Amino acid sequence: MHIAEGFLPPIQAAAWFAVSTPFVIHGAMAVVKQVRKDPESKLLLAAAGAFTFALSAVKLPSVTGSSSHPTGTGAAAILFRPPVVAFIGTLVLLFQAILLAHGGLTTLGANVFSMAVAGPWCGYLMWVSFRKVNKALAVFLAMAVADLATYVVTSFQLAVAYPGADGNFGASLGKFASVFAVTQIPLAIAEGVLGVLLFAFLTKVAGPELTRLGVFTKKEVEAAA
């Protein structure tokens, strides 16, 4: 999903920076508020960031100028809500661009919007919509949809940048999305399953924290213990 350095036209790269910046600033404020409100959540916050970094660092070949990989942002969105993920995801993408040459600095704004803004919000919508139906299903959908939404947005960004020789945006979008789908749909399903296992584990080792964050009720944590 990470769009490579220099792959977007400068004007479009700047536009995505402009679109993403308010979300990142709001996210930074949300992180500060969260830490002040609940200092004990810092460890889980760091773990969510590490989880996102580890999963999104997995790099599989895909569309020219990009790559396929899990995102891990759905878990952080469930735990801390999307504004926090905008800031965490930005740090993850920045470090990956600098340390791993994964993504790029000029394309950071576009990558932030797809992976740290759009994906988490779509995943969180699934969590809110299905959490009262079945928590495991809600976690699965949140993780999988956060992943898939990221790649839909990335396909859109690439189609805008490269609409094809005839300028057909729709055809270009379909081309990018179909190539991503080959690897990304299986990855999204796998990420959803991993998310279910992760939260089953967290209810056992971090039950009080999940209750305090409002992710699970005390009764749900006790039932899972």
PLM segments and residue spans:
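Membrane-helix interface motif
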Residues: S155-G167
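Hydrophobic transmembrane alpha-helices
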Residues: H2-A75
